[in-house]
C-alpha cells in the first residue's frame, strides 16, 4: 500500500500451507530462510475496495544477510520505535499486539 510500511508476506498458492507460504514469501522478498516459531494471530480486515486475512508468526532468521528483492525499502526497527511508522490498518493490529507483548522482530 503506497507510502505505508508493511511486514513481509504475500498470497498463498493453491495447496500451500500457511507455513510453506511464509517460508516462500520471506525467501522471495528478503532472500533469507527462517525457522517458524509460532503463529501468534490472524487478522481479518475489510478495506473500502477489498478484504484481507493476515496470519502473523514469530520467526527467527537462519541467515543474517538480507537481500531484499521485492520492496522499495526495509529496516530493522526497535519495538519502542515501531509505532512511529505508518502501517495499513490491518497491520496496525499486529503492531499493537507485538509491542504490547514485547515480541522481538
How would you label these PLM feature ranges?
Residues 33-35, 41-66, 75, 98:
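Active-site-adjacent beta-strand/loop module that shapes the phosphate/pyrophosphate-binding cleft
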Residues 6-12, 17, 52, 57, ...:
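Short capping/connector residues at structural and topological boundaries
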Residues 7-41, 78:
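The catalytic Nudix box helix
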Residues 1-3:
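A conserved beta-turn-beta hairpin within the catalytic core of GNAT-like acetyltransferases
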Residues 58, 65-99:
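NUDIX/MutT-family hydrolases
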Residues 99-105:
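Generic C-terminal helix-cap and adjacent flexible tail
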